[in-house]
Amino acid sequence: MPPAIARFVAIAAVLLCGHVAVAAESGGVGGGSARRVLHQPLFPIEWTPPPSPPPPPAPDFTSDPSTPPAPDAPSGDFFPPAPPTTTTPTSPGTTPSPTTVAADVSKTPSGSGSGHHGGGPTKATIVAAGAGAAAAVALLGFACAFLITGRARRRGDSQKLLGPDRAGAHRSAATSAADFLYVGTVEPTTPARHHGPTTADLVGSPYRKLRSERARRGVSRDEDADHPSPELRPLPPLRRAATLGSSDEDGYYTPRQLSGGSGGGGAAEAWSSASASSPPTTTTASRRSLPSMTSDFFPPVAAIAAPPAPPPARSRRTPPRTRFSTGSTPDTKQVTSPSPRPVQPSNAPPPPPPPPPPPPPPPPPKLNTAPKPPPPPPPPPSVPSNNNLPKPAEPPAVPTSRRRLLKPLPPEGPRIAMPMPITAATTVDNNGSTSMREGDNAAADDGGSGEPRPKLKPLHWDKVRATSDRAMVWDQLKSSSFQLDEDMIEALFMNNSTPAAPPREVGRKAAGVPSFRQEERVLDPKKAQNIAILLRALNVTREEVSDALLDGNAECLGSELLETLVKMAPTKEEELKLRDYSGDLSKLGSAERFLKAVLDIPFAFKRVDAMLYRANFETEINYLRNSFETLEAACEDLRGSRLFLKLLEAVLRTGNRMNVGTNRGEAKAFKLDTLLKLADVKGTDGKTTLLHFVVQEIIRSEDAKSEKESAMISSSKDDRKHGLKVVSGLSSELGNVKKAATMDFDVLHGYVNKLETGLEKIKSVLQLEKKCTQGQRFFMSMQDFLKEAEREIERVRGEERRALGRVKDITEYFHGDTAKEEAHPLRIFMVVRDFLSTLDQVCREVGRMQQDRTVIGGSARSFRISATSSLPVLSLYGQRRENNSDDDSSSS
């Protein structure tokens, strides 16, 4: 039955009983005398009894039964005032009550007339009996209504706080500031059901003030229970402590799990203490209703740890203010989880007072004293969404049975606590060790705990400096978009510096073993490696090299091997170390062993230099001789070329013709540099240059000198081809000139000086013969070579002087006195080379022009016309033939 209907039925029953009592009293009065006449007034108007003090009220009634009960009486727990009884006066001097019907009826004239008939005591007895029966019926009805109402209210509270599946009992209550009380907070009304606080606790309870405030404001208790404030939903269940303490289903996940035999008060106090002493990541609910609730409903017990949150699968609805907040992400990690402790007795002695933070559990006060409300914790950093309830990490060896979970777990050994951020929740387990619970967003720093984080293996990368003037892909990343699993990454990539110590110790012990890499190293490691690579590439043994150095046989080794040996030459310090080494040669590397064998030969590397000079001497002498011979041949070719001389004549005549009337006219000679300018002077058509004209003139002159001149076209065609071939052959005729143009006389002179310097080194090596006791054949062979080398160098020197003289002569032959102004002695050959390359290009162009003319003339003459052709075609053919004949004659 709904509470409103129950209240309405109770009030109706009270009113009905009151009316029955009035009717019985009226009937009794009227029965003793005559019936009341209808014209007589109901209320007496002519007689007013004298005033008299009202009789004392009955022990079970406080007011008139016709008065409805006050809905907001400050005293009494949901019990409306009982219907009062009206004491019938024995004398007519009773003062009437203006608000009751029974008193008005008793003061009718019938009452006054009762004394005349002698029925006063009988009427009073009937009235008192009827009123008592009516009051008993009303009290019984109201008690039934109250029981029904209380049961419905308890069911509604359970539905609101626990949820349909008692999931609300597993929520962690939130704390709020202590200066605010929620309107409509329900306090226990059945002290017998759960052993609540004592009278002293209730006197100091703020809910007394709440009831007086509700009574003052006129707020109905049941109406407020039907429509609770939204702020009441995060509160934990308050009146199911006794049953939940022994419940096998919900005992582990409710805050009353740790309560003693006195109900759920101890667990609530522990929950309140943990909330007050923990950082703000434990809960995010209001901190104002919690202190008053814990002080009024639950007797204080020593707090152990904040109870773990229930699994999300058991909750159908998560209130918005009962979230655990661990940071900006919903994924919460439980580094160490608290273990449930056994039930604390109600008379447990208080522990010592709490030290400064990290906050330990507060000391539990005695049961007969009201606990002080804990200070409000700092506000949480953020409140996660309603749909993401964080899952606390379970201990590794926690049993799954809820009956076993209610039993105390064995004490857990101390764990290594990870560095915690400020938002980590600190709890204490059975052994007193501190356990931390951190969020994912706190894994990026040390958390201010001062403990260094475990070092992981490094990741070597190149960091890029962020620039503010351009947009980068890294600007799109958010700090909360991805979170790392700190435990997994530390387990996988821990930098094991301690296990790495034994290998280093083994390495130190192994250092005592002889090793050429550490103790027997003589050469630079890089140099030794290069020498070893060269030795493997040459595929030569130490014995072969030693024999060749002792005998002076350069042909046995070759110039490449000798050049490699020169590169292997050690420094003076390395040479001294290798010479003075008297240990085991097998302990040395391959490079050190090879150099040690070479250095055992007296003046080994000076011998190598002498043998390398001897091996390269013949090649260098031949190169110098060929170069000087080419210079002499170039001078002879340039002087004796008839076609080149004719070309110069054609250029001179053409230039004088073009320079008539100027200071440049009537020239008798010109520098060969002018030949490079012929291709720059272009004709009126924009294609033909002055060099084209000169080439065509030379071709025509060559055709004129042919022995047999004939009028046949074929003969003239062959003559024209012969003249073009003669001009084109000038480039091949002056081939030595082009070779000489690639030389540098200063370089050739430097080669000759180098040979003379090497010859001096050979002489210095031969002077060491007196100091050497072995390898005499080397000195004998070197003496023979020295005599021959001196003769060859003298010849080369003579050829050099002769070639240089020829070059000067040819320069004066073409340039006259201006040859002394030439800075480079071989420049004349370079000018002729460049002109010959341009001449070859012009000859190819002239040959294409002649070929085009021949094709056009031949196609016109081979054209045949049939006899049936018309005359205009014949006349056109004759005209075209005449034009072709004129062209041929003009070209010839």
Curated annotation (Swiss-Prot):
Gene3D superfamilies: Formin, FH2 domain
Protein name (Swiss-Prot/TrEMBL): Formin-like protein 8
Organism of derivation: Oryza sativa subsp. japonica (Rice)
Occurrences of domain FH2 (ranges): 446-867
A Pfam family that the UniProt record links to this protein: FH2
Keyword set includes Cytoplasm: no
TM spans (from-to): 126-146
Organism placement in taxonomy: Eukaryota, Viridiplantae, Streptophyta, Embryophyta, Tracheophyta
Family annotation (SUPFAM superfamilies): Formin homology 2 domain (FH2 domain)
UniProt region (Disordered), positions on chain: 43-119, 188-457
